[in-house]
Amino acid sequence: MFRTEDSILPPLEWLSDNNSSVPPAIYDWLMELGSMTLRFERYCTRVHVEPRHEYFIARNELKEEAEHLPESSLYWLREVVLMGDNQPWLLGRTVIPQETLAHHSNALMNLGTLPLGRYLFSNGELTRDYIHIGRKDSLWARRSRLRLSGKPLLLTELFLADSPLYTEDPS
């Protein structure tokens, strides 16, 4: 259950909050406050998750993520590829302090192929502290600190080239 591999996410460049280089249609996606899974479902017949990494890491393995999360003895790391009709649309990385896990009976450790949003948005006690926008070359990313029953977790999402974020709305 401890770290054995490197992250599936490449290093990302985080933009300043007043950066105006984000096209409006992209910005709308990146600032989505609801479930990204539900939004993706409007563009395909099936959304599913392929888990890549699920294990505990120490604080010194968080790098810049450490400044967004409280001290904890361990953090649960979950990295997934979110697929739309079997096309990779998003790389997701969730970092959860052990205290957040304990508050939710460790349910967040047992999501398997369930998209994180299905759990978080069905809970009813979810808030979002902020969304930071980032990039990796021509790909867009976002990082959110969420609170589930007041307990923090950090979610980073990189939207891959086939993601509907880069296309027009289906309507």
Swiss-Prot record:
The lineage of its organism: Bacteria, Pseudomonadati, Pseudomonadota, Alphaproteobacteria, Hyphomicrobiales. Keywords: Cytoplasm, Lyase, Pyruvate, Ubiquinone biosynthesis. It is an enzyme of class 4 (lyase). PANTHER family: CHORISMATE PYRUVATE-LYASE. GO terms for cellular component: cytosol. GO terms for molecular function: chorismate lyase activity. InterPro entries: Chorismate--pyruvate_lyase, Chorismate_lyase_/UTRA_dom_sf. Belongs to the UbiC family. This is Probable chorismate pyruvate-lyase. Its EC number is 4.1.3.40. It comes from Bartonella bacilliformis (strain ATCC 35685 / KC583 / Herrer 020/F12,63). Pfam families: Chor_lyase (PF04345). SUPFAM superfamilies: Chorismate lyase-like. Pathway: Cofactor biosynthesis; ubiquinone biosynthesis. The keyword Lyase applies. It is found in: Cytoplasm. Transmembrane segments: none annotated. It catalyses: chorismate = 4-hydroxybenzoate + pyruvate. Substrate binds at M36, R78, L116, E157. Removes the pyruvyl group from chorismate, with concomitant aromatization of the ring, to provide 4-hydroxybenzoate (4HB) for the ubiquinone pathway. One of its GO terms (biological process) is ubiquinone biosynthetic process.
